[in-house]
């Protein structure tokens, strides 16, 4: 279980295919990992169960108390498969997002959100691949197609994530997949459930009902990565057991230079309510080739600014 005393900033490590190995997990525990995160956006339940089982076995063998955090996918939007896995889009060209499954081309791509044609408005922007590609909505047929103009082009690859920073999404934050995943995680006694793309307090309360109806308990983390969440941040913090500032998606959804002030405000509000606050970002990939000094600097910043976990 996560500890709230601030003797040092605790470490959360995400487990993937490479680290889903008992020997590697043991090394990570010896290196000081406090929480292992399993990401339900990827892989089958059978693979995640292997990870959970290994962690529980190691806790028993080592006398450790490393917690398990199950991260629910939420309504993450992605494009479908692209022709030859990648196409090149030019600035100024026309492009369409469609809700009917298809192989993407230089003219259109499937987007895994059937309500997009009715949710978006002309002039709103659609961001792909963490904002590397930018599209401006020029029209919608209100059924299955949204037409756009490419503002910032480049390579569009299969399965890239999509952000709609100006669009009020009607899809619930807690999806059918999330409910199934949450029940699986509860069945196997994980310590924490993280809900992605939280937009309002009700999102947390809906997940809380599922947890309370299950014989096994778990604490709930609200992941802050949508600007709508900032409008109800007090209620979200109150309804949650901890809060995670997901800098990656949040930095795409709002002006990146605003993120430090936003996270500072969230930290203050969390500490006022005695709720742990977590800094989430892709440290490993960001630090490739950068070196230990930068990594230590990030950890120092996380500690000084008041994050309980990174």
Predicted feature descriptions by range:
Residues 1-310:
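Non-catalytic helical/linker scaffolds that mediate oligomerization, partner binding
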């Amino acid at each position: 279980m996560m500890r709230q005393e601030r003797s040092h900033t605790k470490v959360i490590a995400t487990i993937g295919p490479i680290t889903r190995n008992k020997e590697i997990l043991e090394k990570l525990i010896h290196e000081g990992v406090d929480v292992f995160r399993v990401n339900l956006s990827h892989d089958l339940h059978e693979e995640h169960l292997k990870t959970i089982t290994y962690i529980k076995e190691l806790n028993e063998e080592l006398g450790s108390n490393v917690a398990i955090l199950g991260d629910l996918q939420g309504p993450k939007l992605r494009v479908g498969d692209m022709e030859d896995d990648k196409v090149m889009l030019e600035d100024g060209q026309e492009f369409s997002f469609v809700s009917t499954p298809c192989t993407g081309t230089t003219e259109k791509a499937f987007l895994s959100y059937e309500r997009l044609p009715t949710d978006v408005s002309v002039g709103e922007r659609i961001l792909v691949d963490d904002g590397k590609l930018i599209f401006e909505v020029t029209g919608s047929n209100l059924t299955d197609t949204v037409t756009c103009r490419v503002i910032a082009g480049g390579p569009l690859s299969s399965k890239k994530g999509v952000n709609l920073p100006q669009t009020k999404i009607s899809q619930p934050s807690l999806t059918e997949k999330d409910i199934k995943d949450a029940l699986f995680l509860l069945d196997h006694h994980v310590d924490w459930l993280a809900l992605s793309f939280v937009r309002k307090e009700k999102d947390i309360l809906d997940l809380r009902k599922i947890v309370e109806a299950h014989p096994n308990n778990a604490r709930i983390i609200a992941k802050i990565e949508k600007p709508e969440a900032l409008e109800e941040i007090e209620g979200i913090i109150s309804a949650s057991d901890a809060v995670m500032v997901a800098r990656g998606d949040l930095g795409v959804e709002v002006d990146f230079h605003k993120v430090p002030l936003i996270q500072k405000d969230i930290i203050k509000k969390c500490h006022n309510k005695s709720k742990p606050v977590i800094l989430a970002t892709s440290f490993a990939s960001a630090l490739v080739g950068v070196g230990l000094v930068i990594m230590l600097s990030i950890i120092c910043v996380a500690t000084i600014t008041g994050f309980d976990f990174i």
